[in-house]
Amino acid sequence: MAKEYFWGATLSKDKKIFKWDPESDFLDDEDDDEEDSISHFLFLKQAVLGVNAKDDDRNVIEVETINFDGETVIQPLLSLRLGLNESTNLDIGLQPPVTFKLALGSGPVYLSGQHALDLQEDEEFGKDFEGAEAYEVGDEDLEDEDEGEEDEEEEETPKKGSPKRIVKKIAAVKGRMKGKGDELDEDEDDDEEEEEEEEEIQTAKGKKRPAPSAKGPAKKLAKVDKDGTSKRKVPNGSVENGHAIDDDEDDEEDEDYKVGDEEEEEEATSGEEEEEDEEEEEEEDDEEMALGDDDDEDDDEEDDEDEEGMDDEDEEEEEDSSPVKPAKKAKGKVNGTAKPKGTPKSQANKGMKEKKTYSLEDMKQDLIKSPSKPKKEEKFKNFVKSKFHLSEGKKIQELWGWYKSTQLTAK
């Protein structure tokens, strides 16, 4: 715990030396024990020249104290002069004893700071005092316990001589043990029943037959001896020769096998349906890609794609004719005849394209008037091919150079 107080001192021509030692100034010999628990510190903060100081009078303050090695140190601390520097800030910590001296000048010089007191040792003294009290309380508790034990021994001595009380105690203990034993037996029975139910559920789930093939469900396995009697394994490990050992167990096994077979059949059928759906989606994607390419390519490329489309349809017919998968109708067929890849709309457009031919100047005029102007070379080439049915790379490159030089790409 620390406390701080204001401190001030004045040095002048009448009093040039001031000694600060609170440990020796304010305490008597009787208070030595109290002083050991207090530490004093002095923190200098400011020095100010008084109003009565003389002009051109230099004032120098020296400090005398003891350093860490126990040696006396004398050091100039500050210098003040009227009209030049009349005050100065300080940040110096000192421990007693300290002596301040006006070594030069007539002053007056006013020193100010903080006097701090550290009371940490008082807390330790309080802890020691609390420990002493706790020790005394502990001794009292021990004495009370000893007295209580002596009283109990005195009470037990007459009880030992009375057999009736002993018999009653034994009977009461036996009754308690019996009640606890019955409760334990009931708990064990409940635990066993729960374990049996869990085992039955696990066996019902785990009794799955081997994975069947796609052709059909697995069949029951049975061994036949030479005499014609069938043998099959029973869950308890025994073998039955033509007769059922336990009808209830056989019925449960048959039900489990049926459930397992039905689940396996459902899994097999669902797997086939998923495969069929995936194949149909792939075929639809292929057809959409083929139709998109027909609109962008020229006449020769459209003919090639028509031939490829016919090849794809032939492959689909071969896949549909396989015995494993059910027959499906190929898309694009009506009444057994395949539709051509090109739609009537595309065929009409094709006829219109063949009728009209474009010259280089016509193409340039159309490009200038066209509202949609591609900015990249690849898009420009595709645009020219689809609009003017131009397949000559030289003319396309010439158009691109003109198109780029006219700065139509920036519009």
UniProtKB/Swiss-Prot annotation:
Task: Quote the PTM field.
Answer: Phosphorylated by CaM-kinase II in vitro.
Hey, which family's this protein in? Belongs to the nucleoplasmin family.
**What main location does UniProt list?**
nucleus
Which region ranges are annotated with the description Disordered?
A: 134-378
* Protein name in the entry: Mitotic apparatus protein p62
- Please name the Pfam families in this protein's record: Nucleoplasmin
A Gene Ontology annotation in the biological process aspect, one of them, is: chromatin remodeling
Tell me the compartments it is located in: Nucleus
The protein's UniProt keywords, in alphabetical order, are: Cell cycle, Cell division, Mitosis, Nucleus, Phosphoprotein
PANTHER family, from UniProt?
A: GEO09167P1-RELATED (PTHR22747:SF18), NUCLEOPLASMIN (PTHR22747)
The record's listing under InterPro entries reads: Nucleoplasmin, Nucleoplasmin_core_dom, Nucleoplasmin_core_dom_sf
Q: What superkingdom does the record give? A: Eukaryota
Q: Where is the composition biased (Acidic residues)?
A: 134-156, 183-201, 246-321
- Organism of derivation: Lytechinus pictus (Painted sea urchin)
User: Could you give one GO CC term from the UniProt record?
Assistant: nucleoplasm
What does the function comment of this entry state?
A: Required for mitotic progression. Binds to chromatin.
